[in-house]
From Swiss-Prot:
Composition skew (Low complexity), residue ranges: 43-53, 528-541
Protein name: Lebercilin-like protein
Bias kind Basic and acidic residues: ranges: 487-525, 542-553, 573-588, 632-641
Gene: Lca5l
Coiled coil: 205-335
Homology family: Belongs to the LCA5 family.
InterPro entries for the chain: Lebercilin-like, Lebercilin_dom
Source organism per UniProt: Mus musculus
Residue ranges of the region described as Disordered: 12-54, 91-115, 356-379, 473-597, 632-657, 685-735
Keywords: Coiled coil
Domain of life: Eukaryota
Pfam families xref list: Lebercilin
Biased composition (Polar residues): 689-707
Amino acid sequence: MRLWTMSLADTTEAHTNEHFPSLALGSNKKSTEGKRSPGAGGQSQNSQASNGSVDYSRSQCSCTSLTSHYDYSEDFLSDCSETAVRRLQSEKPLAKAKEKRKYNAGKLPQPRGQKDIPAEKKQFWNASLISSQIQTIAKRRDTMTHRILSARLHKIKELKNELADVHRKLEASAIENQFLKQLQLRHLKAIGKYVNSQNNLPQITAKHQNEVKNLRQLLRKSQEKERAVSRKLRETDGELLRTKDVLQALQRLSEDKNLAEREELTDRLTDLTAKMEANDKKIQNLEKQLRLNNRSYSRQLAKENRKTLAAQTATKTLQAEVRQLQQKLKEKDRELEIKNIYTNRILKNLNDKEDYPKVSSTKSVQADRKSLPSVNMRHQETQKSDVPFWITKGKRGKGNIAHKEKSTETNHDIPYYVCKLPKQEESKRKYEANLTVLKSMPSPPASWGLVATEQICAFHLECHSCTHTADLSKEVEHRKPQTSLETPRRPKENKEDQEKRAIPAEAEPTAKESEAHKDAEDKALTRAAGNAGDAGDAGDAGNDREVVGEHKVVGAQEVVGAQELPGADEADEVHGAGEAPRDVEPGRGRRKTPRKHYSFTEATENLHHGLPTSCRQVSGSPHCRCRHDMGKHRSEQELRLEPAGYEPSFGKGAGARARARARATAFRDRKSSLMEELFGAGFAGRAGSSDSEAVSKSPQTGPQASAGNAFGDSRATVAGSIQASPTEANRKTVV
């Protein structure tokens, strides 16, 4: 019995120690405590067992509360604790009673005279007590351990199940984590590749461009090779065709039975080669000749181009001067309209008359009602500017002409006004109408006589000059190429001076005779002076004024002589007595002479009073003679005009005509040489024939005065003709 209980206890202890180490520790402690204190072993063991169970329940509850959903140990421990409490409450008084009994038994005094109890009996008694106690304890433990073991096994199974679930979940999570890591690595690799591709993009593009360049170079090389091969193929094809042709020709020759012998063929071949060489030499010579001709023609063309350019520049400058002169003419017309009051009144009276013939107004006929002052002024300006352009321009650079003398291109103005002249019949009708009007007009005051004389004289001269417009226009047309082509020939002035010196010696004595003749006429007029008024004195005061003329030659400056220029008094009358001439150079004063008083005829007095008179009487007046002297170069230009019925004489001597003839011949020779040099001998012959005809006609006509000084506005005149040589224009007179 004891052994069984011990074995049971040992087994229970072993089971409890396996599953619950805390209980094993508690039991070991209890056993040790029981051995130490065997008297109080039962109580202590019970109390310790109960405490151990309670502690186990607490620890088990604390351990399993986190893992298990259903905690069976709590119910089990609660029941166990209630039973244990009840047992302890029931066993406490029993234990206390036993202890008291033992204590009382130990304290009871043994009788002194009694014998002690033997030890064997004491041991037997103790063993019986211990066995009884063990039995009770074993019973109690059987029920408790059975319950505890069942609950613990159930709990262990549940925990194992949960552990297996947790292991499965852990394995699944580990597998999933592994897959996620692999996926992350793949993603990282892809991202790295993308970033690297972005960073290496310029390198990739550069590589691509290099590849493209290389491919293009290869393509170009391949194309060049293909072209070369195709070229070679074409060449070979051509050679093949040529060889085939040669082969066919040779076959035909070999098949030809009428072929000559070899010697004859060689002779023919040598002849043909010699001919070919000769032809080649001829071709080379012709090519050389062609090159030489081209060079010569190119040089000639360059010369002609230079000439044409010079002519164009000359024409442009002349046109500019013409425009300036036209502007000056307009200004002079305005001045005349303002100052010539008497002429305006005459025009108004002419407009009021009904019997005045209605004729179309022109710019060059002074009988026109509206353009009388302007036309006279234009002819006056042409008289002032009849010197060629290239002469005046060269002299202007040397400083021997005043700055106001700009009359250089009137050669272009001449055809402009001459082309608009009316016919002879119209001029005659106008002349007759004007005579009738003048006869019917009342006599004006004496102070207006000079102006009327000038107007009527200019009108008569213009009526006669209108009949010869054709010859004058031809002369001006022949003069234009000379004016345009003389500009680039300034270096030849020395030759021109020699030509000037080559003028016949008859000119000088004739000039002296003409001057003596003029002096004689002036003295005769002084003897006939008697009834002239203050107007006559003022009108003829300019006849005594002498102007120093400078004869300027290229390379020398010498004063050669002086000439008289009458007619300056009209300019002083028009612009006022106190106004000095504009073109007088500073430092060159006038040679003052005492005034001469003249007497006039009845015709001149009638003209002073505004009455009409015959043309002979008018022309014999000193005013008309002065007009003739101032417009001498204009009259020399008009020497070529054909004779007409109206020929006023101004007393020009034979010396003046001889001098004009000499100048005309010199000019004609110079002109013919220039024309022959420029345009050939044929053109020069035609020009010479036309000039000779004009000169042959010129002696038949009397000297014609120009209408340019009709209103007395000229301040400086040129003492040479426009038909003279270019060096003749070097002689100038300054007022």
